[in-house]
Amino acid sequence: MSVFTQLEQQLSEQLSQLQSTQGWIQLTAEVNLSVEESLLLGWLKSQNRHFPHFFFEKRDENQTIATIGAVKTFSSLEEAQVFVQSSSLSLVGGIQFEGICQFVLPRLMLVKNSQNLTAYLTLNLSEQAVDFTEFFTELNSTSPVKNYQISAPQSSCTFEQWKANIEQAIIQIKSGDLSKVVLANAIQLTFENLISAYDLVEQSRAINLGCYHFLWAENAQNAFVGSTPERLYYRKGNQLFTEALAGTVAVSDNPIETEQNAQWLLNDAKNIYENLLVVEDIEEHLNAYVEAFEVHLPEIKRLHNVQHLRRRIEAILKADVLDQDCLRQIH
């Protein structure tokens, strides 16, 4: 019997015994067996009738979250914050660069750690009854994860455009219009076959170790995926954890050369200054909400093809500071 079948049976039994009440209720089922993240991605991939989909694998902790469906949606940080505080239920979602956000209370959330796989089924019993027959029919479905070959990567910016952008940025920095810029270039990938966002995340997981991996799919046609080594925001009580990740050098096939590059990065004035700019920016934006900062010594965050200079940052938050306050400042 698969782990999904076991979870389905537990949730179905609880649903059949549920007394008619009003308000939010969350049913929980647990299997004392861990599963691979690829199985969770395959399960998400097979859920064609329940959206949105959300997948999030933590970087430093053995915990992965996969969700489908939405019982309730929120389009502002304020709304999401109020709901979480009043209900103690977990939301998933994110914030765009422009500040637009979307968070949802998922219909079904699976949480995996090193020992257990736990399912959380959320209902609002004050609303019209929902038929879960179809939902449970797909609960046990999984789709195999495939590998893809890239046929034609194409940069969105030519070398001359790249050079012109840098020169323009320097002019604006000298004039005081900007204090810093982050160099970035978009790459358009063309694949030999039709692709699946879920398979791309699995491929990235295998290559980009030591990263957060995530997926957000509004529907079957559109998905946002990524893998990032950098922590933006983690909170535990009145403690906030973030980090400055800036300054980069290559990782080569030669371990000795890679280590030499790392030592150069730790002592290079330009990269140290670049990293400190990020530290200063974080401190400046959070200063009104923080009682004390602790900036750790620089260290190396090594990935499969590059290594970065990183400073871990811890802060003690003032009383009554909300998540939304911090996120608005550092996002």
Feature-to-residue mapping (PLM):
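Residue-level signal for inorganic ion chemistry
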Residues: 176, 233, 280
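An anion-binding catalytic pocket shared by soluble metabolic enzymes
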Residues: 58-61, 65-73, 104, 108, ...
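ATP-grasp fold ATP-binding core
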Residues: 56, 178-185, 214-217
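Contiguous alpha-helical scaffold segments within structured protein domains
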Residues: 2-36, 59-68, 126, 133-160, ...
